Amino acid sequence: MVLEATMILIDNSEWMINGDYIPTRFEAQKDTVHMIFNQKINDNPENMCGLMTIGDNSPQVLSTLTRDYGKFLSAMHDLPVRGNAKFGDGIQIAQLALKHRENKIQRQRIVAFVGSPIVEDEKNLIRLAKRMKKNNVAIDIIHIGELQNESALQHFIDAANSSDSCHLVSIPPSPQLLSDLVNQSPIGQGVVASQNQFEYGVDPNLDVELALALELSMAEERARQEVAAQKSSEETEDKKMQE
């Protein structure tokens, strides 16, 4: 079991209202963030996760490193979706949050969602990546939506990589859930490999309330996605009839 402290960076820029991922880029990210948090926490009893946003024109730490699912869930409530994303600034702030972790034995990892155009200079990003490597910070990037970012992000990961500890996963729009696709990727495999075979990664015998909360949350998410898919189908049919 890997002992890690992980900062998760969610892109809440205005690009996240796009509906090319089910039901939107932003909601698809949130679903995946929940999955990553629970899998990380269940992978090791001393693992911790923190949460940041990188949109709204300024990165913001929503939750410092914690194992408290309630605190983490509350931090994601009513997040604004606006402005532009500051990827580089977000990485730097996340690294500082990891640097001040209480348990220095924990390995450091950043999991960043990027779903809007990268505005930073690529040379500066590569310098930042090398600094992350020097400070032993592993980075995973979940890239959605904006294909023009892929080259810059790949160069960033290449510069940050050490012993294949960093990953870039670019996921095009798909009828499948983003969380499922991430789960099947190298990022997901790294998280899930040592996980027990309990639904949602939680043993209900150890934490009944958490298992029930996850079950209800996933049921609500599935219902919302079904409504969104039905609405999209009806709108498409109406357009065809009008033509």
UniProtKB/Swiss-Prot annotation:
Listed GO CC annotations: cytosol; nucleus; proteasome regulatory particle, base subcomplex; proteasome regulatory particle, lid subcomplex
Subcellular location: Nucleus
Domain VWFA: 5-185
UIM domain mapped to chain residues: 205-224
Feature: compositional bias, Basic and acidic residues: 232-243
CDD domains, A to Z: VWA_26S_proteasome_subunit
Domain of life, source organism: Eukaryota
PROSITE patterns associated with the record: UIM, VWFA
Membrane as UniProt keyword: no
SMART domains with a match to the protein in the record: VWA
GO terms for MF: K48-linked polyubiquitin modification-dependent protein binding
Residue ranges, annotated region (Disordered): 223-243
Keywords: Nucleus, Proteasome, Ubl conjugation pathway
Transmembrane region(s): none
Keyword field contains Magnesium: no
Gene Ontology biological process terms in this record: mitotic recombination-dependent replication fork processing; proteasome-mediated ubiquitin-dependent protein catabolic process; stalled replication fork localization to nuclear periphery
Subunit text: The 26S proteasome is composed of a core protease, known as the 20S proteasome, capped at one or both ends by the 19S regulatory complex (RC). The RC is composed of at least 18 different subunits in two subcomplexes, the base and the lid, which form the portions proximal and distal to the 20S proteolytic core, respectively. Interacts with uch2.
Function in brief: Protects ubiquitin chains against dissambly by deubiquitinating enzymes thereby promoting protein degradation.
Family note: Belongs to the proteasome subunit S5A family.
Protein name per its UniProtKB record: 26S proteasome regulatory subunit rpn10
